[in-house]
Regions:
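Extreme N-terminal tail/first-helix region
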Residues: 1-17
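A short, mixed-charge helix-start or loop-turn motif at secondary-structure junctions
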Residues: 1-2, 79-84, 120-127
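Acidic/histidine-rich alpha-helical segments that form the ligand environment
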Residues: 8-12, 77-114, 134
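Structural signal for well-ordered, non-membrane alpha-helices
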Residues: 13, 17-21, 51-54, 58, ...
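Surface-exposed helix-capping loop/turn segments at secondary-structure junctions
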Residues: 22-27, 106-114, 150-155
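Short, contiguous alpha-helical
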Residues: 29-73, 116-155
């Protein structure tokens, strides 16, 4: 596995701790922009989607080019259930699950990494591309959390 993927799998998510440092739980849960997710909802989305991603990776490894539907957090009962948990519980699960996920993924063989699945918008992607997609999607939400936290720290 390329080091740029393995390094991000190991460490990228940990920036969340720094991004929300100094914010109260009330601030983390505050909706800064009307109709948009709070920091908390972005974090819950990352935590919930990570579990879905693991399931999809397993389907890719076990199947022959499976096709996945578009994911919608609002339609995912796990997302809604997880919104009732504390920020600490969500972060703990995100970090623990990522550690387990990464330790398995860095062991994938070349044959594993070239297995494919269909993405509804991007078409056929191999497992390495799926990992990159996962990390870029996560980075997008981390940047959103960064912007929301900056806004909250100004007020």
């Amino acid at each position: 596995m390329p080091s740029n993927i393995s390094t991000r799998l190991h460490y990228q998510h940990k920036s969340l701790i720094d991004l929300i440092d100094g914010l109260s739980d009330e601030q983390v849960r505050r909706q800064v922009n009307i109709g948009k997710w709070s920091i908390f909802e972005n974090i819950v989305h990352l935590q919930t989607y990570q579990h879905l991603f693991i399931a999809r990776v397993n389907q890719i490894l076990e199947g022959t080019n499976p096709a996945f539907p578009r994911y919608s957090a609002e339609a995912d009962p796990s997302f809604l259930d997880n919104c009732s948990l504390s920020t600490r519980e969500i972060l703990q699960d995100l970090i623990t699950t990522r550690k387990d996920m990464t330790s398995g993924m860095v062991q994938f063989s070349h044959d594993d990494l070239i297995k494919t699945a269909e993405h509804p918008a991007f078409g056929k992607m191999n497992l390495l591309q799926w990992m990159n997609f996962f990390l870029l999607h996560e980075a997008h939400h981390l940047f959103t959390v960064f912007k929301l936290a900056a806004e909250l720290k100004k007020s």
